[in-house]
From Swiss-Prot:
This is Uncharacterized membrane protein PA4757. Its main location: membrane. InterPro entries: Homoserine/Threonine_efflux, LeuE-type. The chain crosses the membrane at residues 12-32, 48-68, 74-94, 134-154, 156-176, 191-211. It comes from the Bacteria. It comes from Pseudomonas aeruginosa (strain ATCC 15692 / DSM 22644 / CIP 104116 / JCM 14847 / LMG 12228 / 1C / PRS 101 / PAO1). GO terms for biological process: L-leucine transport. Belongs to the Rht family.
Length: 216
């Protein structure tokens, strides 16, 4: 029996868990931020991800997915902007890793001076930078909404809240994992720089993937 217009509820929850667990730029950014700057800053980044995902899900519900399909040039423009931002973040991490190798003490001092709101803004932009996420949300959610239910908006809202709750649990795990990794990496500066380089390279790869994404 559908509940609040939701069909196959537990199938949806299981699907959300698998989707959230897939490695992506949002989760990697939160992990890297918490490893570099601690729990509080990690949660600021996580809040940026939550807000960004909420905006994308709202846009999906408002029909922006149909607009993107109807206007391919809009989709192309947005995806290239998103890819450029992923490149920017990736190159920044690669440069930071190089600086850390050359002068670990100076890098640590610079990290202390970073604007505390910067991780939130970066994570928010990162979450909003993928127009294909709008298409994903609408195509994923619609499978679990009963077409005969009188209030489909309520069904969509419940599905969105469940996704955000699962995301919050997973990102919390990553934040505390990142803090533990930071303590370990502090004694191994070369390894820390290598890990940062790896994450930066992944972000560049995510940028390439987004730049070559299609509507289909």
């Amino acid at each position: 029996m559908p509940t609040l217009g939701i069909t196959d509820f537990w199938t949806y929850v299981l699907g959300v868990v698998f989707v959230i667990l897939l490695p992506g730029p949002n989760s990697l950014f939160v992990l890297a931020t918490s490893a570099q700057r601690g729990v509080a800053t990690g949660y600021r980044a996580a809040c940026g991800v939550f807000l960004g995902d909420a905006v994308l899900m709202l846009l999906s519900a408002l029909g922006v997915a149909s607009l993107l399909k109807a206007e391919p040039m809009l989709f192309i423009g947005l995806k290239y902007l998103g890819a450029a931002y992923l490149f920017y973040l990736g190159v920044g991490m690669l440069r930071g890793a190089w600086r850390k190798l050359r002068n670990p003490e100076a890098t640590a001092a610079q990290a202390e001076q970073v604007d505390v709101h910067q991780p939130f803004r970066k994570a928010l932009l990162l979450s909003l930078s993928n127009p294909k996420a709008i298409l994903f949300f609408i195509s994923f959610f619609i499978q679990f909404v009963d077409p005969g239910y009188a209030y489909p908006g309520l069904s969509f809202l419940v599905l969105a809240v469940i996704l955000e709750l699962v995301s919050a649990l997973y990102l919390s795990f990553l934040i505390f994992t990142g803090v533990r990794l930071a303590a370990w990496f502090r004694r191994r500066q070369r390894l820390a720089a290598g890990a940062t380089s790896g994450v930066g390279a992944l972000f560049v790869g995510f940028g390439v993937k987004l730049a070559t994404a299609t509507l289909s």
